[in-house]
Amino acid sequence: MIPNHTPAAESDRFLKFLLHLGFLISGTLTVLIGQVLPILSARLLLDDTQAGYFFIAQFSGSLMGTFLTQPIVKRFGFGGAIVLGFLAMLVGVLGLNSDAWLVCAAAFVVTGFGIGLTLPSINMLTVELNPQNVTPALNFLNFFWGVGAIFCKPFIDFFGTPTSILQPTFILAILLFITGLAIGFASHRNRRKESFDQIESENPMPIWTTSTAWLIAVFNFVHVGFESGTGGWITTYAMRLPNQDGSVAWLSPTFAYFLFFVLGRFAAPVFARFLDENRMLLLGLLTTTLGVIILLWGDTLGVLALGASIAGFGTSSIFPTNMARFTKTFGATATRRATPLFICGTLGAALTTWLIGYISTNYNDLRFGMIVLLGSCLFLICLQVFLYARSRTTVST
């Protein structure tokens, strides 16, 4: 096949490059809250409950951004929505340098709004740019999100100090400004808008009038809460260990968690060749539970890194596999009507991260708060067994 070197094709390739770079930066911004939480807590003299409200602030902003994505894309196109999202993240991340708790909370709301607007916009624009290879294109795109998440902790450790995040947030602001501006210019040439008003003519299968859909949504509520709680609190949890093993300080539990999270995404297609969605989910949940148990009982950074690696690998395939189950159950067009599913995930993330901080403050021990993660895993295993048994009953009848 002769390579396509037309100006339009070259423009699309450059835009794709910028979108992947933007998604990498967005991955860093998404998990930034967990990495700066110990610094903000020390600077503002916060207990875990007060710090936990920052999670609610960010996820509230993210929920607003997700809700407003469709009308903003309709009005300004994907490029305009992404630029607005990057601008919000820029303003929010700089606001984290304030010495006022309320200003920092507002900054997390603004940052969350940018994240909630940017991630779906980049995903949808990637679909528009790759109509023939949607699945591999999205998998490759989300790999870059994972890379950004992996390097967030080392980035903050290298450029920040125990009491200041001015330098790393300033660097992120510059990257957001340059990348957002470049995406705006690159996407201006061909304004791509999603035809959200287009409804399938073939009477789509009902979704949210069924109990199965809401059970899958509850599954998403708890699981996204687990992922957010782990990613958000594991850095603080590791820093409070009485036995700090300096020999493994570089391979921190946070770094290990996100590293094996990305590796798990790569390994998932191999397992999918031999296992269906239900068995994949159960295997992932059992692996995750093992990792969480090691996390809770570990007393050195090395043991925590091991538990975080196992938990990250186990949980990595659960969200996409649950989405695949949702689509397989309700049809290929179900993703266009999956808004309640994503809302449940955002609400679960806000509740779980806050609950961990609340329990930690009341028992004066973050380990008690982290038990919420184990409870989440056990609940998900029970729910998955129920959904699996229910699906077998439905098929047999």
PLM features: what roles do these ranges have?
Residues L40-S41, I72-V73, F155-T163, A238-M239, ...:
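Interfacial helix-cap and linker-helix signal at transmembrane-aqueous boundaries
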Residues I33-G34, S211-V262:
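Extracytoplasmic gate region of multi-pass secondary transporters
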Residues L15, L21-L40, L46, T230-T235:
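Extracytoplasmic
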Residues M64-L102:
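Conserved MFS/SLC helix-loop-helix module at the cytosolic interface between two early adjacent transmembrane helices
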Residues W101, Q132-N133, F140-H188:
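Helix-loop-helix hairpin linking two adjacent transmembrane segments in secondary transporters
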Residues F108-F143:
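Cytoplasmic helix-loop-helix junction between adjacent transmembrane helices
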Residues Q58-S60, G146-V147, Y257-V262, T346-G348:
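Short hydrophobic/small-residue motifs within alpha-helical transmembrane segments
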Residues N278-N322:
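C-terminal transmembrane helical hairpin of 12-TM major facilitator-type secondary transporters
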